[in-house]
From Swiss-Prot:
Source organism: Methylocella silvestris (strain DSM 15510 / CIP 108128 / LMG 27833 / NCIMB 13906 / BL2)
Known pathway: Cell wall biogenesis; peptidoglycan biosynthesis
Sequence intervals crossing the membrane: 27-47, 74-94, 99-119, 135-155, 165-185, 199-219, 236-256, 263-283, 288-308, 337-357
One Pfam family in the UniProt entry: Glycos_transf_4
GO terms of molecular function: metal ion binding; phospho-N-acetylmuramoyl-pentapeptide-transferase activity; UDP-N-acetylmuramoyl-L-alanyl-D-glutamyl-meso-2,6-diaminopimelyl-D-alanyl-D-alanine:undecaprenyl-phosphate transferase activity
One Gene Ontology term from the biological process aspect of the record: cell wall organization
Gene Ontology CC: plasma membrane
Top EC class of this enzyme: transferase
Catalytic activity, reaction form: UDP-N-acetyl-alpha-D-muramoyl-L-alanyl-gamma-D-glutamyl-meso-2,6-diaminopimeloyl-D-alanyl-D-alanine + di-trans,octa-cis-undecaprenyl phosphate = di-trans,octa-cis-undecaprenyl diphospho-N-acetyl-alpha-D-muramoyl-L-alanyl-D-glutamyl-meso-2,6-diaminopimeloyl-D-alanyl-D-alanine + UMP
Family affiliation: Belongs to the glycosyltransferase 4 family. MraY subfamily.
Keywords tagged on the record: Cell cycle, Cell division, Cell inner membrane, Cell membrane, Cell shape, Cell wall biogenesis/degradation, Magnesium, Membrane, Metal-binding, Peptidoglycan synthesis, Transferase, Transmembrane, Transmembrane helix
Protein encoded by which gene: mraY
Name this protein carries in UniProt: Phospho-N-acetylmuramoyl-pentapeptide-transferase
């Protein structure tokens, strides 16, 4: 929105700063951070009153959680999403269709997560939105977003690029409408599965957002993309502003979500943020790199899949508990140990993901 101020730059030179993506990304980060800082306590207080008993704690989870997390309100994703959306609308170029597509996915997934959280809190049960209906809605939203990208994007919007291989990509054609939604829906649910400990999901989300902010900036620049041998995606650089808003809102939320958490992000936040990461990855044509950068989310998801398949086929569990962060809790790791070590893994994976830009 603030980009319109650039038309007055001939009369006041500093307004020319609003032309630069890097400046607006910093502004989006700061705005989202202060928004969540300011409104966070008010939102937490309101949710605590509305929810009463807070998020129901699973009886089949770690027993310590029944004591340490009981009564904590959920739906903290409202803090993140409100800060993220307000900041994006303020600092991004609203004529950029990628911004609107990503916000569409984020808001849509956030609404699904919100309804899921509402059902869990109102019924005081871990059973929320019926899985099949929820998945169908996610696929519908992701499919609509990918279709919009096809209509508004470039000729290589439907291509799938492979990291570390210069210029090699496969044109998916209409199959893009299968692969794209799969990436977005998978990312949303993977982050959702990871959100099981105080601060565990939000920091890896911020790390991934920062990484894809860099990738979006490079992919949206004709000179940098040509030099690196990656697809040039006109307008993709504007998504750096969105990822900057994610980082700012995430930092603000972490202030209240640090152990012991005053609030949980719930499905409202985790599903929306995961969907956002997936949508950005699809938009900038680095879907496979997302699996590297978000490798922690992939690991959490695979641990659940392996656990379910193993138990159904053999009656035995591979892990003491799934997702895998609970497995390490059962091994005797304290919650802060699990969280910080997983943060380290996420940071290392982000560095590996970024390195693929030069390994070509």
């Amino acid at each position: 929105m603030l980009t319109w101020l650039t038309q007055f730059s001939p009369h006041f030179q500093p307004l020319n700063l609003f032309r630069y993506i890097t400046f607006r990304t910093g502004g989006a980060t700061a705005t989202a951070l202060f928004f969540v800082f300011f409104f966070g306590p008010r939102i937490i207080a309101a949710l605590r009153i509305k929810q009463g008993k807070g998020q129901p704690i699973r009886l089949d989870g770690p027993q310590s959680h029944l004591l340490t997390k009981k009564g904590t309100p959920t739906m903290g994703g409202l803090m993140i999403l409100s800060g993220l959306i307000v900041s994006t609308l303020l600092w991004a170029n609203l004529r950029n269709h990628y911004v609107w597509v990503v916000l569409f996915v984020t808001t849509g997934f956030g609404l699904i997560g919100f309804y899921d959280d509402y059902l869990k809190v109102s019924k005081q049960s871990h059973k929320g939105f019926p899985g099949r209906i929820r998945l169908l809605l996610e696929v519908g939203i992701a499919g609509a977003a990918c279709y919009a990208m096809m209509l508004l994007g470039t000729p290589h919007t439907t291509s799938l690029a492979f990291p570390a291989i210069n210029g090699f990509a496969v044109d998916l054609g209409l199959f893009f409408l299968v692969v794209g939604p799969f990436v977005i829906v998978s990312a949303g649910n993977a982050v959702n599965l990871t959100d099981g400990l105080d601060g565990l999901a939000i920091v890896p989300v911020m790390i991934a957002a920062g990484t894809f902010g860099v990738i979006a900036y490079l992919a949206g620049n004709a000179i940098f993309s040509t030099y690196l041998g990656i697809n040039f995606v006109p307008g993709a650089g504007e998504l750096s502003v969105v990822t900057g808003a994610v980082i700012g809102a995430g930092l603000g939320f972490l202030w209240f979500n640090a152990p012991p958490a005053q609030i949980f992000m719930g499905d409202t936040g985790s599903l929306a943020l995961g969907g956002l990461l997936g949508a950005v990855a699809v938009a900038v044509k680095h879907e496979i790199v997302l699996a590297i950068v978000g490798g922690l989310f992939v690991l959490e998801t695979l641990s659940v899949i392996v656990q379910v398949i193993s138990f159904k086929l053999t009656g035995r569990r591979v892990f003491k508990m799934a997702p895998i962060h609970h497995h390490f809790e059962q091994l005797g790791w304290s919650e802060p140990q699990v969280v910080v070590r997983f943060w380290i893994i996420a940071f290392v994976l982000a560095l590996i993901g970024l390195s693929t830009l030069k390994l070509r």
